[in-house]
């Protein structure tokens, strides 16, 4: 699975002008399932997202994770947005190819799994809508933007 993690002071996602997910300070996660991914990669990625120490302590050092935030009030939210274009292949020509992304049914299944597990592990999880045309608004804090990838084990054939 591929993700782009952004520390935000606020973020929201809209569909047809309506807010469908919104958080205060926390993390915006753009998420893409790749061919060959399974719940194993999803779970590993979620663990990394929750434990990554990218929030500042009193001394200004990145020492706190999303798990360290209570998720109440305006701090500690996780906004998860599906984005299959993270699997773009731009190696040939000028038009990106998306054959490395999971098929839509598998992508939805893994996205839903990720969100369900996130909701079990963290008190404030909001989402966009899988497959929808969305507008994402965010105020990047820092900025802190980190690409993440949990690849399937070597030898696992793409589906």
Curated annotation (Swiss-Prot):
Residue ranges annotated as motif Gly-cisPro motif, important for rejection of L-amino acids: 142-143
The protein's Enzyme Commission number: 3.1.1.96
Keyword Ubl conjugation: no
Domains as described in the record: A Gly-cisPro motif from one monomer fits into the active site of the other monomer to allow specific chiral rejection of L-amino acids.
Principal subcellular localization: cytoplasm
Name of the protein this chain belongs to: D-aminoacyl-tRNA deacylase
Family: Belongs to the DTD family.
GO cellular component terms given for this protein: cytoplasm
Quaternary assembly: Homodimer.
Pfam families: Tyr_Deacylase
Transmembrane parts of this sequence: none
Location in or out of the cell: Cytoplasm
UniProt-listed HAMAP family: Deacylase_Dtd
Alphabetic keyword roster: Cytoplasm, Hydrolase, RNA-binding, tRNA-binding
Catalytic activity: glycyl-tRNA(Ala) + H2O = tRNA(Ala) + glycine + H(+); a D-aminoacyl-tRNA + H2O = a tRNA + a D-alpha-amino acid + H(+)
Gene3D superfamilies xref list: D-tyrosyl-tRNA(Tyr) deacylase (3.50.80.10)
């Amino acid at each position: 699975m591929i993700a782009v993690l952004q520390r935000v002071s606020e973020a929201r996602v809209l569909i047809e002008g309506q807010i469908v997910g919104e958080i205060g300070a926390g993390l915006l996660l753009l998420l893409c399932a790749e061919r060959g991914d399974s719940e194993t990669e999803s779970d590993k990625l979620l663990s990394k997202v929750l434990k990554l120490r990218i929030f500042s302590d009193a001394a200004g050092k990145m020492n706190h994770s999303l798990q360290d935030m209570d998720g109440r009030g305006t701090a500690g939210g996780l906004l998860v947005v599906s984005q299959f274009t993270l699997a773009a292949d731009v190696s040939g020509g000028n038009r990106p190819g998306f054959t490395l992304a999971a098929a839509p049914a598998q992508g939805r299944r893994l996205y839903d799994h990720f969100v369900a597990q996130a909701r079990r592990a963290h008190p404030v999880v909001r989402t966009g809508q899988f497959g929808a045309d969305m507008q994402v608004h965010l105020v990047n804090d820092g900025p802190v933007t980190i690409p993440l990838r949990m690849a399937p084990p070597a030898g696992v054939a793409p589906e």
